[in-house]
Amino acid sequence: MKRLAIISLMSDGGCHIAFLELHEELLHLLGQVELIHSYMLVDRREIPEHIDIALIEGGVRTTHDIELLKEARSKSKILVALGSCACFGGIPGLSNLYDLRASLDYVYRGTPTTTEGVIPHENVPSVIRVAPISRFVQVDLQIPGCPPEPEEIKEAIVSLIKGEVPSQPSKTVCDECELGPPKEKPRRLRKIYEPPEPDRCLLEQGYFCMGPVTRAGCGAKCPRIGVPCDGCSGPAPKALDQGISILDALVTLAYKNIENFSLKQHSAYFYRYTFASSVIEDLLRKKLRERR
């Protein structure tokens, strides 16, 4: 029987919950694997040896995360990035838009503050720029999403148990959406609180929808109920960079509405989940290395 472990780094636990949301199917799955590590289900603190499949949730934020990640990699035959934080850095990666020291000063020395104004440094891990786990170890499979789809988690584990390569979506959310893709250019950009017209592409109506550049697999759940896709599953297979891809699309569709582009202002849209793994982040890291 294959040995399965779920290991958490910087995480809110949402991906772990997505695994548990298999409900009764989880019982069938646990009949095929031995769950040897899970902070929600197994009373065991240390990472065990001889892991066949390790699911890693959360991105890297501290030096402790790096050590834990490398330990998991050394003890695992197959390592899977579970969720968009592990795959791309996730929403915490937007903090990389700001200077790390300034961010720490704001949290610990800002006004008002509930701390003594001292940044912890003794006997605690160092805080670093947010990064996907692939920046430090080899990743064998990615299951993105915030959170990932429980069914996709199950299907991936079942395939790995059988020694098969799990199938991965090759299309975009737009391909899964009954409303899109857009057939005409939007006349203006709409706010998310404005009620959409039913049965019409949201991007076409002027809502900021990431569907054209986002990996399929969710069934376009958000656009189907009138909520624009926010790109939580990361870039579509053929998109080199999610933010650059959607910016390119918007230049074609609505150039006049985005001519006052601001990296810090718009990155929460273009790179909500993928800034830490973006081309821009690579350039920022290179610039920081040159300064040293």
Where are the regions that the model predicts?
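Iron-sulfur (Fe-S) cluster-binding modules
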Residues: 1-55, 64-66, 70-78, 101-292
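Short, hinge-like loop/turn segments at secondary-structure boundaries
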Residues: 96-100
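Short glycine-/small-residue-rich Rossmann-like dinucleotide-binding loops
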Residues: 58-60, 84
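Short aromatic-enriched loop/helix-cap "lid" or pocket-rim segments at secondary-structure transitions
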Residues: 93
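Short gly/pro/ser/thr-enriched loop/turn and capping motifs at secondary-structure boundaries
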Residues: 85-90
